[in-house]
């Protein structure tokens, strides 16, 4: 879902590195490996020169001074913002409700993605030696990266369902904190299960014994059938369409419920406060889903194009690496926005922020509030 392909190979190119003539265990020289690559043209293994796969990497290295600071900025902003959001929700018992628990689950997924997956993936994209973190992490990082996307999707869906229940059935007892914890655990387990097919086809190939100073960690799906395309379509629906659909259905259902149960006449102050509070919470949900959808749209479209065009007729190999990095950077930036959206719509979070930034001033305000409450 959020993968950057460093070593772009058409499906047929995998034969070059996995057959008996060119395996990591052989003592084949670099020249022999190059001849094997050149020979693939005459054998009809690919419609273009397999050495073209390295052209995009050369172009990508030119943009390295631009992309690395941007990625560092994303990691710092998302790391600090989501850590602060988690600290606010976990430290204040008044914030322990269903919506905030699901928001903390969303923040935990974004934090995990930005602090673990993004640095390793970016290092792989820009390191001329390829994957430098060993075989276990080669399989684990793509799994976590894909799973965190599903965690975000399912958490946003859970928030949408919770908002509908609160508005449409206000007298119904809300789910407990322990119940929310169980749902959050289920979200993580389901996300790992949905991400598993991708990790099953990850291959770790060390080409250094063959005279090529490169370690490859990539997806290689079977040649026969359309498993990769089917999984991409499933991922597009499950990780992109579901949150948009859930929020749309929730919004329509809430609108119908409010019109159905609205009481004629001037609403009381308590009703106005209740309506305003619910409107703010739903605005938070809509803003989060829109930010997620807009950030992930370029990468979703690009991944679908690559699956439909494995021979790179639509997008040339020279530009595909740079395009992947651009789309990946925009997608990863989605982890930065939720803390700001939540803080702008939640007064208690803003109070916590003031407390962290100006602790002395916060203590004075607390003393004034206590004095006024005693009087």
PLM region spans:
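Alpha-helical transmembrane segments of multi-pass membrane proteins
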Residues: 75, 105-118, 146, 184-195, ...
